[in-house]
Amino acid sequence: MDEADPGEAEAAQAEAAQDGAAQDGAARDALLLLSWLSPGYPVGAYAYSHGLEWAAEAGDVRDEASLGAWLADVLSHGAARNDAILAAHAHGAGLAGDPRAAEALNDLALALAPSRELHLETSQQGRSFLDATVAAWPAPGLEALATRLPGPVAYPVAVGLAAGAHRIARRSLVTGYLSAFLQNQVSAALRLAPVGQSAGTRVVAALSPLVAALAAEAEGAPLDALGAATLRLDLGSFRHETQYSRIFRS
């Protein structure tokens, strides 16, 4: 029997060690993102519907099919896509520890909010997220970046900065962010009662491939790619401010 080549054995061991390290890194990324984007994370995501409450009141969202169509448009043409691009760029600022880039991105993200309620939705969640994450998951550079953003912080910017500072993979960040957005919207729809739990689960499953495709696109998209075309949602967010009966803040 031929003796094993020591060089080949060492190479195999090194490759196995690299694979193990990569798996450990992916598991760590998943654990952080699952914690940060969980409904239990103290950002108050449950209080916002991103215009969905008005859409249900107006009859735009009334069943499984209309909910799926509404959310597909919000993901593809609305704030969700913009947020994914902003989160990806904030990831770069967090990775580099670049406070100027963080400030510029935050100013841009807040300026993109089309109404008072949607501005509150992103700024309150972002501020809460950054404060909670700095306290519970400190990372080199993250606290310094947070001190440069003492006021309102856009939610995608806060999540992106934290993910970059913790060296989470960018694609994982963007995919997790979009998935959490979708899940929160469906959760709001369940409370508004146009769909039940089984229908909501089917909507999430049907839109998951779109989430993956948008994450791949947003990961490397330039800021020039920002833009939205969800006028019905934007106008509805204005009307929601004076809606007679409501349970959400947006």
Curated annotation (Swiss-Prot):
Q: Which GO terms describe its cellular component?
A: cytoplasm
Q: Provide the GO MF annotations for this entry.
A: nickel cation binding
What broad class describes the main subcellular location of this protein? cytoplasm
Locations listed in the record: Cytoplasm
Locate the compositionally biased regions of type Low complexity: 9-21
Cite the Pfam families for this sequence: UreF
Alphabetical UniProt keywords: Chaperone, Cytoplasm, Nickel insertion
Cytoplasm found in the keyword field: yes
In the UniProt record, does the keyword Transmembrane helix occur? no
Which residue ranges does the record annotate as region Disordered?
Answer: 1-21
The subunit field of the Swiss-Prot or TrEMBL record says: UreD, UreF and UreG form a complex that acts as a GTP-hydrolysis-dependent molecular chaperone, activating the urease apoprotein by helping to assemble the nickel containing metallocenter of UreC. The UreE protein probably delivers the nickel.
Task: Name the job this protein performs.
Answer: Required for maturation of urease via the functional incorporation of the urease nickel metallocenter.
The family annotation for this protein states:
Belongs to the UreF family.
The protein's name in its UniProt record: Urease accessory protein UreF
Q: Which gene underlies this protein?
A: ureF
